[in-house]
């Protein structure tokens, strides 16, 4: 995610794109950094992965035989050697930053060096249909708990505990939010526009969900109706159940959207209903790939078999993504791996798509 062209050229390019291009809906670019200490087994491991919308496109792993930022999507492979060199150097610099931040966190929390600890950082930008910043974010976590986060105004911080308040005071004194805001409003959006253009066929597609409802008897008195959406992209989708037109949100079991392993996603929503009253329930599906929302009912004559194989495959892929990327459950609260008490270092260039000028340093 590093810029390979001179910044002046990039700004001209992004300005041209902003004037001539529009995008359906909003789009996002996010980076997830994770550093894990392992006492007695060498330096902490550092992994960063980059996503445009729901597509992973780059990955760096400090444990690789020859650590480099590597492509994870065909459309990013067109970037030249300078891009990959710059992204690699930014990732290596962040790895060193987070290793130092792990040491600082031990002091802040009065912890022993004998245990393993984790720092996570999630940051990025959302862009609206007009090609401009919709929202920016930077959130960090330590050992799976919120640490510090940039507020929506992009100019202030929220610290989760007294240790994080030390970091907050340092960053406020150094006006770190200003640097981060400049990256989010400028470089981040510029690169997101570029990636959307280069990966147009993949990133700007909308795969229509394949939908159906299945029926699962629980007893003589109750049954589960499960509404399925399969093979859709992008991942954002809404599934809701209604009874006689009234939302059943409180009574609905809803699973997280899952990758299917082929670049699409899966999701289901279930509700327990009294036997014999199934016809009173409707499932409503909203997705970018649909010209209008769908309304589904269970049709007894077309009872479907649950696609267990597909769901199991999706879960397996999800496990690989989570474990392999070591991005754990930090997304759940949008935690990230910022430096505990760190400050942003002025790295070699602000042209990195990762934002080398917002690297958290102790």
From Swiss-Prot:
Its main location: membrane. It holds the Pfam family MHC_I. Residues 25-114 are annotated as: Alpha-1. InterPro entries: Ig-like_dom, Ig-like_dom_sf, Ig-like_fold, Ig/MHC_CS, Ig_C1-set, MHC_class-I_related, MHC_I-like_Ag-recog, MHC_I-like_Ag-recog_sf. Residues 25-308 are extracellular. Residues 115-206 are annotated as: Alpha-2. Residues 1-24 form the signal peptide. It comes from the Eukaryota. The keyword Glycoprotein applies. One of its GO terms (biological process) is immune response. Disulfide bonds join 125-188, 227-283. Residues 343-362 have a biased composition (Low complexity). The chain crosses the membrane at residues 309-332. One of its GO terms (molecular function) is signaling receptor binding. It is a single-pass type I membrane protein. Keywords: Disulfide bond, Glycoprotein, Immunity, Membrane, MHC I, Signal, Transmembrane, Transmembrane helix. Residues 335-362 are annotated as: Disordered. Residues 207-298 are annotated as: Alpha-3. Glycans are attached at residue 110. Heterodimer of an alpha chain and a beta chain (beta-2-microglobulin). Involved in the presentation of foreign antigens to the immune system. This is Class I histocompatibility antigen, Gogo-B*0103 alpha chain.
């Amino acid at each position: 995610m590093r810029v390979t062209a001179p910044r002046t050229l990039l700004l001209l390019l992004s300005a041209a794109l902003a004037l001539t291009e529009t995008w359906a809906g909003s789009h996002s670019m996010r980076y997830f950094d994770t550093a894990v200490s392992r006492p007695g087994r060498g330096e902490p491991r550092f992994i960063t992965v980059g996503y445009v919308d729901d597509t992973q496109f780059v990955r760096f792993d400090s444990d690789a035989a020859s650590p480099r930022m590597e492509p994870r999507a065909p459309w990013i492979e067109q970037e030249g050697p300078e891009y990959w060199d710059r992204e690699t150097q930014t990732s290596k610099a962040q790895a060193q930053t987070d290793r130092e931040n792990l040491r600082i966190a031990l002091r802040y929390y009065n912890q022993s060096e004998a245990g393993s600890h984790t720092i996570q950082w999630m940051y990025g930008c959302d862009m609206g249909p007009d090609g401009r910043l919709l929202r920016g974010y930077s959130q960090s976590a330590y050992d799976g708990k919120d640490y510090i986060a940039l507020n929506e105004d992009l100019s202030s911080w929220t610290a989760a505990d007294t240790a994080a308040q030390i970091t907050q005071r340092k960053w406020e004194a150094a006006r770190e939010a200003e640097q981060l805001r400049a990256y989010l409003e400028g470089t981040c959006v510029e690169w997101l526009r570029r990636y959307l253009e280069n990966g147009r066929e993949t990133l700007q597609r909308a795969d229509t969900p394949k939908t159906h409802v299945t029926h699962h008897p629980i007893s003589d008195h109750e049954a589960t109706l499960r509404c399925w959406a399969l093979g859709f992209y992008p991942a954002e989708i809404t599934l809701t159940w209604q009874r006689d037109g009234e939302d059943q949100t409180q009574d609905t079991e809803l699973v997280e959207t899952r990758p299917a392993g082929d670049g699409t996603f899966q999701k289901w929503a279930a509700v327990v209903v009294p036997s014999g009253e199934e016809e009173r329930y409707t499932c409503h599906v909203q997705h970018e790939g649909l010209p209008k929302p769908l309304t589904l009912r269970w049709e007894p004559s077309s009872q479907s078999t649950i696609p267990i194989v597909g769901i199991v495959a999706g879960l397996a892929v999800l496990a690989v993504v989570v474990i392999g990327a070591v991005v754990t459950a930090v997304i759940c609260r949008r935690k990230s791996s910022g430096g505990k008490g760190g400050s942003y270092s002025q790295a070699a260039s602000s042209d990195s798509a990762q934002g080398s000028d917002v690297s958290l340093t102790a």
